[in-house]
Regions:
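N-terminal amphipathic/basic-hydrophobic helices that include classical n-h-c signal peptides
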Residues: 1-17
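Alpha/beta catalytic barrel-like cores
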Residues: 18-167, 174, 183-184, 191, ...
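Active-site oxyanion-binding pockets that recognize sulfate/phosphate
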Residues: 165-172, 210-214
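A structural/positional concept
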Residues: 178-180
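Aromatic- and glycine-enriched pocket-lining scaffold segments that form the walls
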Residues: 196-210
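Short linear capping/connector segments at secondary-structure termini
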Residues: 204-206, 245, 347
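Acidic/histidine-rich catalytic cores of soluble enzymes
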Residues: 210-323
Length: 438
């Protein structure tokens, strides 16, 4: 049994550590203030920005409605033990992950994560809100909103690699009905949580080799999306999006939903559709950070999937790297960009602890948002507008070594989570829970 002196000594040590952290934050606050940055305001603002956490990191995009392989030109690699196998395990894992994350959260769900009870099963074209009641209960208990995605992959009705663009009318109609069902489910999510639901339409439709007809599939794709969006919904509650992609595994030569197609569709249907950009879905030399202000010039709202592509859409865990920071900066710097941009994460790594993957990616983007909010953006804009490019460069370089780590520690403290040392909790969860899964 430990003595009172030992316990008292530990408490004193903890108090001194907290005082040291506050001293460091006060020092950082003064440094930022010299550049006109209010770190208290930055922290307060960062707490208000919702970021949608994707459920599919927890089980390698398997879902609950099939036991077949992952298709659609996407791929998970690795076989780290502890993958969630049931709705109960997935929800428990998400809970553990979210308990270690600062900031405001939403939950992003794919249609293949319908939770059927009492032996019930319906196909994707017959899905109903009741099949996602547990997700709604889970989100409401935690004060979170929900986003949604029709699942146009990993299903027998994906014929010859095509869904909404298929020349087979039966195939197209099946997927159109799936999309309409997802509109209804998205409306249910928003009505129940009181938070708008982003519903993203993405398919892996395309061809492995050079097609003879490039336009036909795109015309069919457009008509299918038109049919999906003919389903009645409240545009204040449901935010349908179309997402493009440059290529996928097995569809290297031609993707129906290309960047030009998807952006054009959203532009022609601004009243009911948003453009969604995934920063892994473009040529490796393109950067989504540069596209954000371009789209916000013309669209009232846009949506993002933030990932980390390595040479292709590899969906590596998001890190606090250059492009992640630039994406966050553009969200913050663009006029009302924070209020006009729906942010979600999208990555899946099966080679590492999946809870750690969730937490690392979410924290990395939170850190990027906080860093962006702590930039002297108005000063830098003024320097650019007055052609003081040398000074702008100097200040931008100076910003790279500002004490953002101390501001981050204070942000985490105010959010009730550890800035560092949180991996011990994940290791404990792995030892006590994940390692027991066959």
């Amino acid at each position: 049994m430990r003595s009172i002196l030992e316990v008292g000594s530990e408490q004193l040590h903890f108090t001194k550590m907290e005082e040291e952290k506050m001293t460091r934050y006060e020092s950082a606050k003064e440094i930022y203030a010299k550049l006109g940055v209010d770190t208290d305001a930055a922290i307060a603002k960062c707490k208000e920005i919702p970021v949608s956490l994707h459920c599919w990191q927890g089980d390698d995009v398997t879902g609950f409605d099939h036991d077949g392989p992952l298709t659609g030109g996407i791929q998970t690699t690795g076989n780290y033990p502890g993958k969630a196998r049931t709705p109960e395990e997935l929800l428990a894992d998400m809970d553990k992950a979210m308990s270690l994350m600062p900031g405001k959260k939403k939950i992003n769900v794919h249609a293949c994560y319908a939770i059927f009870e009492d032996g019930e099963f319906v196909d994707r074209d017959k899905l109903e809100p009741k099949h996602f009641r547990k997700w709604v209960d889970f989100a409401k208990e935690r004060g979170m909103g929900l986003d949604f995605n029709p699942t146009f992959f990993s299903h027998p009705m994906v014929k010859d690699g095509l869904t909404l663009s298929s020349p087979d009318e039966e195939v197209r109609n099946f997927w159109i009905e799936h999309g309409k069902a997802c509109i209804r489910i998205s409306q249910y999510f928003a009505e129940q949580t009181g938070v708008p639901c982003v519903m993203n339409i993405w398919t892996g439709d395309g061809f492995k080799d050079i097609p003879a007809d490039r336009m036909g599939p795109r015309v069919r794709y457009k008509e299918s999306i038109d049919a999906i969006l003919s389903e009645p919904f409240d545009t204040n509650l449901v935010k349908p999006c179309v997402e493009s992609k440059v290529f996928g595994i097995g569809v290297e030569a031609y993707t129906v939903g290309s960047a030009e197609f998807s952006l054009s569709y959203a532009a022609m249907n601004k009243d009911k559709c948003l453009p969604l950009m995934d920063n892994g879905h473009y040529h490796p030399t393109e950067v989504v950070s540069d596209k954000i202000p371009a789209l916000l010039t013309f669209f009232p709202e846009i949506a993002l999937h933030v990932t980390r592509p390595i040479r292709w859409d590899s969906d590596h865990v998001v890190l606090f790297d250059d492009e992640t920071k630039e994406i966050a900066k553009e969200i913050v710097r663009c006029e009302n960009g924070i209020d006009r941009t729906y942010i979600a994460l999208d990555y899946f790594d099966a080679s590492i602890n999946r809870i750690s993957a969730w937490v690392t990616g979410f924290r990395s983007f939170q850190k990027a948002l906080l860093d962006a909010l702590c930039q002297p953006s108005e000063m830098l804009k003024e320097l650019q507008d007055t052609n003081q490019m040398s000074k702008k460069m100097v200040v931008m370089e100076q910003c790279k070594t500002l004490p953002i780590g101390d501001v981050w520690e204070e942000y985490c403290r105010q959010c009730g989570v550890e800035a560092e040392g949180w991996f011990d909790e994940i290791q404990k969860y792995e030892d006590e829970v994940l390692s027991k899964r066959a």
